[in-house]
Amino acid sequence: MSPAFDIAPLDATFGAVVTGVKLADLDDAGWLDLQAAWLEYALLVFPDQHLTREQQIAFARRFGPLEFEMAAISNVRPDGSLRVESDNDDMMKILKGNMGWHADSTYMPVQAKGAVFSAEVVPSVGGQTGFADMRAAYDALDEDLKARVETLQARHSLHYSQSKLGHQTKAADGEYSGYGLHDGPVPLRPLVKIHPETGRKSLLIGRHAHAIPGLEPAESERLLQQLIDFACQPPRIYHHDWAPGDAVLWDNRCLLHQATPWDMTQKRIMWHSRIAGDPASETALAH
């Protein structure tokens, strides 16, 4: 039986736009069809949803427990005033850091499963969210490089990735603390991940990854940058141009994502609900 909604694949190795469905009214049969599509496409885009906070949280919960229910990713302060780049406060540091390709919570003991992200207010230009298919990236590696990365691991740290931008994080950093700053031992993760539900292999890289055991620091950095540069190229990438009311659901176990710049004199208000990873498959090798 075909699903009760329409699926239009993106012009990329992954992703689809889903129409003919209201996520707030999704029944159990529809959710099962949607989950199957998510595992196939890894990224689902839902235009014109206009979810309330409660509806977004409820939809995200259908995929499992949440790492956190809702976080505002925005250059607008709670009092309505605009953050400016020169403020360089915790949230501005997060916004700038998120412009590097990354997967969520790889620097935590348990990596996130996925996320629901929605747009409330968007700028007139810029502010897209990019996604990159690490399944297709792994498949496209030459056999020698594929064999090499199969044997390697890397450390993942938000302290490391933010320090590369000149941001010195602290355990007590206000908005970092809610974002999942991990102050324990640095997690170690394989460069090649096997998806726990589909069995497909993908690269596990991104801006938090560093310090491959057995390699000199410079060689480790070169290899990780080489992999990102190769992986995050067409047809393995898609950048979503947001409209108010859009929602997306992505699989954090096989995609990277990034924010893109915009004129920060314009408001951008986004809402992020993060789906917790299953400890059986998403726990770091060491942490």
UniProtKB/Swiss-Prot annotation:
The keyword Iron applies. Changing R207A: The dioxygenase activity with S-2,4-MCPP and (RS)-2,4-MCPP is 17 and 8% of the wild-type, respectively. 15 and 10-fold decrease of the affinity binding for S-2,4-MCPP and (RS)-2,4-MCPP, respectively. Its EC number is 1.14.11.43. GO terms for molecular function: dioxygenase activity; metal ion binding. It holds the Pfam family TauD. This is (S)-phenoxypropionate/alpha-ketoglutarate-dioxygenase. Optimum pH is about 6.5. Pathway: Xenobiotic degradation; 2-(2,4-dichlorophenoxy)propanoate degradation. It comes from the Bacteria. Monomer. Fe cation binds at H102, D104, H257. GO terms for biological process: catabolic process. The record marks E69, R207 as: Contributes to enantiospecificity. Involved in the degradation of the phenoxypropionate herbicides. Catalyzes the enantiospecific cleavage of the ether bond in the herbicid S-dichlorprop ((S)-2-(2,4-dichlorophenoxy)propionate)(S-2,4-DP) and S-mecoprop ((S)-2-(4-chloro-2-methylphenoxy)propionate)(S-2,4-MCPP). It can also accept (RS)-2-(4-chloro-2-methylphenoxy)propionate ((RS)-2,4-MCPP) and phenoxyacetate derivatives such as 2,4-dichlorophenoxyacetate (2,4-D), however it can only accept 2-oxoglutarate as oxygen acceptor. Keywords: Aromatic hydrocarbons catabolism, Dioxygenase, Iron, Metal-binding, Oxidoreductase. Signal peptide: none annotated. The gene is sdpA. InterPro entries: TauD-like_sf, TauD/TfdA-like, TfdA_dioxygenase. It catalyses: (S)-2-(4-chloro-2-methylphenoxy)propanoate + 2-oxoglutarate + O2 = 2-methyl-4-chlorophenol + pyruvate + succinate + CO2; (S)-(2,4-dichlorophenoxy)propanoate + 2-oxoglutarate + O2 = 2,4-dichlorophenol + pyruvate + succinate + CO2. Changing R274A: Loss of the dioxygenase activity. It comes from Sphingobium herbicidovorans (strain ATCC 700291 / DSM 11019 / CCUG 56400 / KCTC 2939 / LMG 18315 / NBRC 16415 / MH) (Sphingomonas herbicidovorans). Optimum temperature is between 35 and 40 degrees Celsius. The keyword Methyltransferase does not apply.
